[in-house]
Amino acid sequence: MSAAEKIALYWAYPFVRYALVVGVLIALCASLLGVTLVLKRFSFIGDGLSHVAFGAMAVAAVLGLHNDMPLILGITVVCAILLLRTGQHAKIKGDAAIAMISVGALAIGYLLMNLFSTSSNLSGDVCSTLFGSTSILTLTETEVGLCVALSALVLLTFILFYNKIFAVTFDENFAKAVGIKVKFYNLLIAVMIAVVIVLAMNLVGSLLISALV
């Protein structure tokens, strides 16, 4: 069998195609938003929100929810908004607040999974959640479709509002002076980064998202 035939055989498996599509879309969204977050001095927000998402996933598991996406996305979006809106003005500044939320959410998530989990393989469940070790192989067509739709929405939003996001990122005072709604665009950035993090959990796990964002 030639190399070309081996490659063709490899790509014949649906999970390989699904992983490629989802991985490329998530990497593209994360790279665009990552630059914005670094310039806003929130470079560790990806790591913090990924741990928040892990805690939310543990809560969903305890509640026995079959579709945990709405709960995880909702909690992650709320935390992202709180961090971006209060991190610059609170007594505890950005990175310190992120570190506190990150450690707290991770500890609460693992505690809940230990106390209330009905799984016989808790360590395996935690490992796959943190590192995405099995999620790559189990992506369904529905999950891929959802990822494509949400990634396209994030990219389209970023492109349409790029100039205003650029202004808010570099100088919020200037943005306010020229009439840009700074609070709204900070909210928009928070929602977009939360969406990307929740989507990425299915592929790379909650711990490795910080390498992308």
Regions found by a protein language model. Give the residues of each.
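Membrane-interfacial amphipathic/re-entrant helices at transmembrane-helix boundaries
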Residues: 1-28
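Transmembrane helix-bundle core of multi-pass membrane transporters
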Residues: 6, 102-159
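Interfacial loop-to-helix junctions that mark the boundaries of transmembrane helices
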Residues: 10-19, 64-70, 91-97, 135-146
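Hydrophobic alpha-helical transmembrane segments
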Residues: 20-24, 69-74, 96-100, 144-149, ...
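Short hydrophobic alpha-helical membrane-embedded segments
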Residues: 23-27, 45-53, 73-77, 182-192, ...
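Generic alpha-helical transmembrane segments of integral inner-membrane proteins
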Residues: 24, 28, 32, 74-82, ...
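Short loop segments and helix-boundary regions at transmembrane helix junctions
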Residues: 35-120
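Helix-loop-helix "hairpin" substructures at the membrane interface of multi-pass membrane proteins
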Residues: 139-213
